[in-house]
Swiss-Prot record:
Signal peptide: none annotated. GO terms for molecular function: manganese ion transmembrane transporter activity. The keyword Protease does not apply. It comes from the Bacteria. This is Putative manganese efflux pump MntP. One of its GO terms (cellular component) is plasma membrane. The keyword Transmembrane helix applies.
Amino acid sequence: MTFEQLIPLIIMAFALGMDAFSVSLGMGMMALKIRQILYIGVTIGIFHIIMPFIGMVLGRVLSEQYGDIAHFAGAILLIGLGFYIVYSSILENEETRTTPIGISLFVFAFGVSIDSFSVGLSLGIYGAQTIITILLFGFVSMLLAWTGLFIGRHAKGMLGTYGEIVGGIILVGFGLYLLFPI
């Protein structure tokens, strides 16, 4: 994989991880122990590996069977997901956040990684390298979740919505780029 191929994946990994970062900011404002913060970040990272992997496998199958239609659908999926993230982050009300423990941690990690499934589906259609992509998505999401949790301990929610909006705009941009390559 060349450096030029790696840069878009890194940017996309940050776009996907912004959801975990934003939610972690709010969660970090609670009294969490360092061990809890580390565990939450690792769990989010693992889900950001599993979800795009499943999406990429499914995307490759669709690509082999449906070719150009799958290519177009993958781009539209990224654009739609990006707009949805922007829309929902602008309109969502501030909800009560609880510390995820046990099953609720898995539900939480699944919730913030569901968009990586869709992106994985699109990347699978385009034939992206699976191992590098999923490890990058997982690692960046874990780091962003930890960053959000630690910043949240010190700041009172300055970036939450804005982080999600930026992530959504980046996904829209990549979807448009796939539809209309420069």
